[in-house]
């Protein structure tokens, strides 16, 4: 399934979160940014969760060591990480992309596997960092020459790789990781985040093809590219940018970009005018990308019950396994994501928002899943270990 629309190439139990936690979250993020300005990229503990659910999140979560299931990591590495360090998207023609490389680097840090981290990072540098800036080309195709035909970036991949480098610098004390993290984070802040428009800052999905100058309905954004747990960490690498403000703009969009009877966001959202609306030229669906929004909220420990409500409502009413892809205009499923790894996302969201213990299947990744559900499952495991150990019965 192609989760990256080809349009890039053309242009491109109850009351766990109180209503007041969002304000507390904003303050926590601001304090995190101030701390980062005082000591850029020095080792230290990540900021406290911006909103503290009754699931009792860890007060000082660390990514390093958060993936405690060594067997699950070995199986994932054997299936999806080549000897050279290429993370293979098994359901997408065997391509690789900046998203997958970033996820692989994060999981390697979480597993304490520096050797694999180095392999993935080395392949990423050699094959995706081929632009004239510090951002990454978004897609590498093994059966094409050149393998990178589209030099546009994907901002979620840029953010994930920069975040992984920040975590690696803290975990292993390598100044090279610190330097690389800063280079990428600075270009994200300068080139991809619209900070000075007189409106809340926006994260463009890529450098080309999404701005108001390039699209009649622009700017167009993708809320799943707001990788909320990354932003306080990027403040360590590039403290001159207001990452806390970017977090707040994303939280506001999660509340305002809700469409149709199910009140769900679409993958691609037009922010032209006073109100968000589904972007032109893309299916108006809540789908593969958008299912990550509650993952990132929960991982960051932010949001109120209202932020999680439409996702929990959708996933709590399922009459079959898997997650639905929803036509937002009609509020009906048009497809189902059947592989078991996807079920980790509702479990993590219910844990974060309601304190619901995760089911036994949450801790049992399946061996034969494709790259995307397998990756989301391990990310959810790491997030739960970092912030919601009480939901794991620990």
Residue ranges of model-derived segments:
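Extended ligand-binding clefts on enzyme/binding-domain cores
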Residues: 62-63, 67, 71, 95-98, ...
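Bacterial N-terminal signal peptides
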Residues: 20-32
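Substrate-binding cleft of extracellular glycoside hydrolase catalytic domains
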Residues: 129, 133-187
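Boundary at the C-terminal end of the N-terminal hydrophobic targeting segment
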Residues: 36-40
């Amino acid at each position: 399934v192609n989760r990256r629309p080809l349009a890039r190439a053309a242009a491109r139990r109850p009351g766990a979160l109180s209503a007041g936690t969002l304000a507390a979250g904003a303050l926590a993020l601001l304090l995190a940014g101030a701390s980062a300005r005082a000591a850029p990229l020095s080792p230290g503990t990540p900021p406290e969760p911006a909103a503290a659910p009754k699931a009792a999140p860890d007060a000082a979560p660390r990514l390093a060591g958060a993936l405690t299931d060594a067997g699950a990591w070995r199986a994932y590495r054997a299936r999806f990480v080549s000897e050279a360090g290429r993370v293979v998207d098994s359901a997408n023609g065997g391509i690789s992309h900046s998203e997958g490389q970033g996820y692989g680097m994060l999981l390697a840090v979480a597993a304490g596997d520096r050797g694999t981290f180095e392999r993935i990072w080395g392949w990423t540098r050699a094959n995706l960092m081929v632009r004239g800036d510090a951002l990454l080309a978004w897609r590498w195709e093994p059966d094409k020459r050149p393998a990178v035909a589209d030099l546009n970036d994907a901002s979620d991949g840029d953010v994930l790789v920069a975040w992984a480098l920040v975590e690696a610098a803290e975990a292993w004390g390598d100044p090279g990781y610190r330097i690389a993290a800063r280079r990428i984070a600075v270009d994200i802040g300068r080139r991809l985040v619209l900070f000075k428009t007189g409106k809340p800052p926006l994260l463009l999905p890529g450098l080309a093809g999404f701005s108001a100058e390039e699209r009649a309905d622009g700017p167009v954004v993708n809320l799943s590219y707001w990788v909320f747990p990354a932003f306080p960490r990027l403040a360590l690498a590039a403290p001159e940018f207001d990452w806390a403000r970017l977090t707040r703009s994303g939280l506001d969009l999660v509340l305002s970009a809700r469409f149709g009877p199910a009140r769900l966001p679409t993958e691609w959202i037009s922010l032209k005018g006073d109100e968000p609306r589904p972007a032109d030229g893309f299916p108006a669906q809540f789908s593969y990308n958008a299912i990550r929004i509650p993952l990132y909220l929960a991982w960051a420990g932010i949001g109120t019950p209202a932020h999680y409500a439409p996702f929990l409502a959708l996933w709590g009413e399922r009459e079959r396994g898997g997650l639905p892809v929803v036509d937002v205009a009609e509020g009906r499923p048009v497809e189902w994501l059947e592989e078991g790894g996807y079920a980790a996302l509702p479990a993590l969201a219910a844990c974060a928002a309601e304190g619901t213990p995760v089911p036994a299947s949450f801790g049992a990744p399946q061996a034969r899943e494709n790259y995307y559900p397998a990756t989301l499952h391990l990310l959810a495991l790491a997030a739960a270990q970092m912030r919601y150990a009480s939901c794991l019965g620990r």
